[in-house]
Amino acid sequence: MAVVMDGVKKNIIDRTIPNLVKKFQNFNNDDIAYFLKLLHETGIDLFEINRDSMDKIKKFPLNLDYIYRIENIEDYNYLNNYNFKYIILNYKTIYRFLLEDEKIQKNLKEHNIILEIDIEDLDELYLSEDNKIFCIFNIVCLRINNLSKLDFIDEDFRIKDLKSKFNVLVDFCASNKYNMATAIIINAFLNGSDIITTEFNSNDYAAMEEVIIALKSIRNIEIRGDLKLISKLTRIYEKITSERVYSMKPILGEDIFKYESGIHADGIAKNPKNYEPFNPELIGTNRKLYIGKHSGKAALVVKFKELNLNCNNIDMNLFLQDIREKSIQEKRNVLDNEIIEMYKEYNKSYQR
């Protein structure tokens, strides 16, 4: 699985698991395994985990590629038990491992390392004349962390310069401090980043679902995965967390493709692109027309077609009036089965 732009394969790292582990205590291993499986089939290549993840989740799917974060010596103890694709070391803490015994240093040198560095420390790395860590460790990727604004000047040039100067791949992990993480990650992707780091349904980082749907629907980037699984991902995520995803959450919310007003309904019937940035079928769901007190005749005609009802058999204006009255009386929309029952009653009265 991967994302392909102009024939170049790029990878996506998912870091959902560490944040789930941080927020919640108990997990069903089968649910976690299914969640990771769906993420992989959606198009995620690499899964970031840490020691807390390993402590609380006893069984990870073996056919996936994992990245292991090491922040201290206690984290190191898990390193030899699993075959990790990469390990993550932070720029501020990597030097402490040079003070450890030679056995630990030697072991770390045998692994492919993603060096994570906060954006504010990047100049320090650039200006350092003695970047011995690049000689000592096998650093294959540089992750730019905590980028919170679209102010990475001459981003295309900077990314190329990073690759050239340090002979590494470049990964971006943006902070959502100013609600710009998704835009930052998309911009980095389009400007040469080899890897992007996201999180499912995230408020802290770039939301995975927003990034891949934006790349697909706006830029028509090739996503080598089944995006229709996103609706299933949402359901298993809700099961794991015992929390409902916000109903109007972009991409994931269950109400984002619901509509009622007459003009809206008529417009979608004629051309959905007037109202929808992408077809709901792309993510394995459907649009839903609700009929209620705000609905007009055009919306009712669309609903009749949806329910295979013949609008020529009855007085649609009178039927609409009854629909509105029922909606006001019940203080909600009128359900499909109720519309069908009302239609049957109307037909009976016409036949008498």
UniProtKB/Swiss-Prot annotation:
Pfam families: HCS_D2 (PF22617). Keywords: Nitrogen fixation, Transferase. It is an enzyme of class 2 (transferase). GO terms for biological process: nitrogen fixation. Its EC number is 2.3.3.14. Belongs to the alpha-IPM synthase/homocitrate synthase family. PANTHER family: HOMOCITRATE SYNTHASE (PTHR42880), ISOPROPYLMALATE_HOMOCITRATE_CITRAMALATE SYNTHASE FAMILY PROTEIN (PTHR42880:SF1). Heterodimer of an alpha and an omega chain. This is Homocitrate synthase, omega subunit. It comes from Clostridium pasteurianum. The gene is nifV-OMEGA.
